[in-house]
Amino acid sequence: MLWPRLAAAEWAALAWELLGASVLLIAVRWLVRRLGPRPGGLGRSGTPVPPPSAAAAPASGEMTMDALLARLKLLNPDDLREEIVKAGLKCGPITSTTRFIFEKKLAQALLEQGGRLSSFYHHEAGVTALSQDPQRILKPAEGNPTDQAGFSEDRDFGYSVGLNPPEEEAVTSKTCSVPPSDTDTYRAGATASKEPPLYYGVCPVYEDVPARNERIYVYENKKEALQAVKMIKGSRFKAFSTREDAEKFARGICDYFPSPSKTSLPLSPVKTAPLFSNDRLKDGLCLSESETVNKERANSYKNPRTQDLTAKLRKAVEKGEEDTFSDLIWSNPRYLIGSGDNPTIVQEGCRYNVMHVAAKENQASICQLTLDVLENPDFMRLMYPDDDEAMLQKRIRYVVDLYLNTPDKMGYDTPLHFACKFGNADVVNVLSSHHLIVKNSRNKYDKTPEDVICERSKNKSVELKERIREYLKGHYYVPLLRAEETSSPVIGELWSPDQTAEASHVSRYGGSPRDPVLTLRAFAGPLSPAKAEDFRKLWKTPPREKAGFLHHVKKSDPERGFERVGRELAHELGYPWVEYWEFLGCFVDLSSQEGLQRLEEYLTQQEIGKKAQQETGEREASCRDKATTSGSNSISVRAFLDEDDMSLEEIKNRQNAARNNSPPTVGAFGHTRCSAFPLEQEADLIEAAEPGGPHSSRNGLCHPLNHSRTLAGKRPKAPRGEEAHLPPVSDLTVEFDKLNLQNIGRSVSKTPDESTKTKDQILTSRINAVERDLLEPSPADQLGNGHRRTESEMSARIAKMSLSPSSPRHEDQLEVTREPARRLFLFGEEPSKLDQDVLAALECADVDPHQFPAVHRWKSAVLCYSPSDRQSWPSPAVKGRFKSQLPDLSGPHSYSPGRNSVAGSNPAKPGLGSPGRYSPVHGSQLRRMARLAELAAL
């Protein structure tokens, strides 16, 4: 009996011990759960283990690498490559776009292998201390820990795959205020509940609007959302804290979030503390409605099909079809810019873009066109119409950098590697001249572009290889700077696009504000550094055998002397050369094909404008003649009043009044033209010759010969009976007029032939003015034969003077009138120093008359003058300044509109030598001399 009792007592004691141990264990576990895991706890391996929440929240994980990434950014590409190799990672070409990927991979590897590098121990400890549980998000504000509370946000899933676009603003933790009255209630709910769930909206690429309502892709699991993105081509997803926002994104309503430069708010919706409203707990967003509306509008361009990229775009690049290529990319910018602002892949497998193919196929024009289009803001606005200028420039710089420096997938070769490898010097010139190019990038075999020159083309010449090496060394230019004043020009220091931090020369020569402002007028290049320095020295101090001539050119031509010297040296050495021409408005070498084409277009436009101007002037002149000539017996008032000073109605009134006061003594008119004087001179001569004669005409009109006899070229005989002879004052007046015209012609033209031609043209123009007044028939055709005999005698007398040996024949005058010899120069019908400068620039150019007909005609017109005459031509500025002091011998429109036209002058207004602008002062002087001659004859 004793043994069973002892056994029962032992079992009871053992049971109580087990019960006590269980209670103690439960208490310990409760305490541990109550306190929660400490952030400084170590795992089994002895390394710091981040809490599960840190792994679940991408924002916290990225924040732990900030300091490490900042240290890696300080390393140069070679040191970074060594660290990547030491960490056991594969290293490819490190460029400005791929560097971030390698830095991120290296940072993750270093965090996992923290024991290898002692320099990262401190950082790991700090990173571990910074990680916090999402449930411990309450932060004190102004000493009160219960006033405000914040939740950590979920980082937006951006461009984490592939190459990153321009860095958007950092997504920071957003704290939303909670009313103090709800603090206790919120604390109770926060401790009992977990972090609010996330909703992932997947937005496919919809091809039409009705398809947006068919199905909505919203997931609560991130893996499911990623799987949906992989299955739906071209789709994207984003995390939201509410299902409504995720559904809006999936439908495409809230497509993008604001650009970094437009708002300071984060790109993705921010999870905030639950707020009480209408007795229900709702998830609020710290994003105002006004800023939510300000979204980036998605463009309507579709992703091109793979067949279009290969069959259309790539074929156009390979064949060098610039028009087809330009039409494709401007019709749809996604031919060049893919998702994530990455270059569009035109050849799968190797992942070639347009620049790879163009560099491989030696299509330098396609390379240049691609860069020009990508750097055009209008093209980028097709993709992002709502971006401001700053963000647009960031995108442009990013995309251009990707096109220039992105390696392919096989050998990590950049477009510059391809151009050098195949010996395409023109492509190397285009690529290496861009300021964003990386010339020392290494491929898979650790070779730079300079190391692979002509690897795939062994038969290339040594000169070509040397030229490619010079292109890779850098592009330098030798500039010529001029001031707006008459100070001497300055040959500037060497300049290169690579010089970003420091400028070799500034816009001012010197440091004083009183120094003149200098502008770029010409430059030689691109050249290698050695050639550019040699050319600069040669330009400043020419060789001894040419020093005298070049010094004379500089001193004798202060406007373009230095340009002429630099041009001759550059052409002699075969260096590229351009200079600025004001009338073209661009930098160009006129001796090149491009320069000749621009000059041809300019001269063609000048000729077209001149013809249109002449037609307009002829129409205006005919309208004025019809308005001022109402009949054959009308008195012309142009000798006493300009047409511009009186209206058409006033002219008609005065003509009618004169017709009523004068007897009709004029007979019928023919259609031939024979008068040698302007209308006003003839009126004065007739009044002075026959002041009281019964057959004198007060209107001053002379009458032509008989039509048939004039055409036969015979001189008409005066009819029998009354013969009215003009006094000798007529011959005196003719001689006086010729002397006056001869003096005017000599003052303008130095050669006697030109003076004679000018005089004949003026006489012919005056005859034509009278002819226009005599064309219309008048009511005086019905007068008697006596008046007709008087008219015939007067016409015969005037015809005799006009057809005398001292004057040109009538047929020659008509021929000159019908086909005047017009010579069009750069600034009108008169040459200037600019014509001489352009002729000097075309000295070594071969102008094809079939390809450049306008340039050939202009050059022939300039070469008609002797070198001494060309040296005396005024410059455009001086010519425009003194134009008002020179007589206008060529009549209206002697100058083409432009910089030579006098301000405020009417281009259709006749000049001093025109019949329509004969001054009353000259008429009165001529009248007095005619009367004195008449008295002397008596």
From Swiss-Prot:
Its main location: endoplasmic reticulum. The chain crosses the membrane at residues 13-32. It is a single-pass type III membrane protein. It is found in: Endoplasmic reticulum membrane. Residues 609-627 have a biased composition (Basic and acidic residues). Residues 609-636, 870-924 are annotated as: Disordered. ANK repeats lie at residues 411-440. GO terms for cellular component: endoplasmic reticulum; endoplasmic reticulum membrane; membrane. Changing residue 229 to G: In MCPH16; uncertain significance; severe loss of VRK1 nuclear localization in non-dividing cells. One of its GO terms (molecular function) is protein phosphatase regulator activity. GO terms for biological process: cell division; central nervous system development; mitotic nuclear membrane reassembly; negative regulation of apoptotic process; negative regulation of phosphorylation; regulation of catalytic activity. It holds the Pfam family Ank. InterPro entries: ANKLE2_3rd, Ankyrin_rpt, Ankyrin_rpt-contain_sf, LEM/LEM-like_dom_sf, LEM_ANKL2, LEM_dom, RNase_H1_N, RNase_H1_N_sf. Residues 69-113 form the LEM domain. Residues 1-12 are lumenal. The modification Phosphoserine is found at residues 259, 268, 488, 496, 512, 528, 662, 804, 896, 914. Residues 33-938 are cytoplasmic. Keywords: ANK repeat, Cell cycle, Cell division, Disease variant, Endoplasmic reticulum, Membrane, Mitosis, Phosphoprotein, Primary microcephaly, Signal-anchor, Transmembrane, Transmembrane helix. It is linked to Microcephaly 16, primary, autosomal recessive: A form of microcephaly, a disease defined as a head circumference more than 3 standard deviations below the age, sex and ethnically matched mean. Brain weight is markedly reduced and the cerebral cortex is disproportionately small. Belongs to the ANKLE2 family. Involved in mitotic nuclear envelope reassembly by promoting dephosphorylation of BAF/BANF1 during mitotic exit. Coordinates the control of BAF/BANF1 dephosphorylation by inhibiting VRK1 kinase and promoting dephosphorylation of BAF/BANF1 by protein phosphatase 2A (PP2A), thereby facilitating nuclear envelope assembly. May regulate nuclear localization of VRK1 in non-dividing cells. It is unclear whether it acts as a real PP2A regulatory subunit or whether it is involved in recruitment of the PP2A complex. Involved in brain development. Interacts with BAF/BANF1. Interacts with protein phosphatase 2A (PP2A) components PPP2C (PPP2CA or PPP2CB) and PPP2R1A. This is Ankyrin repeat and LEM domain-containing protein 2.
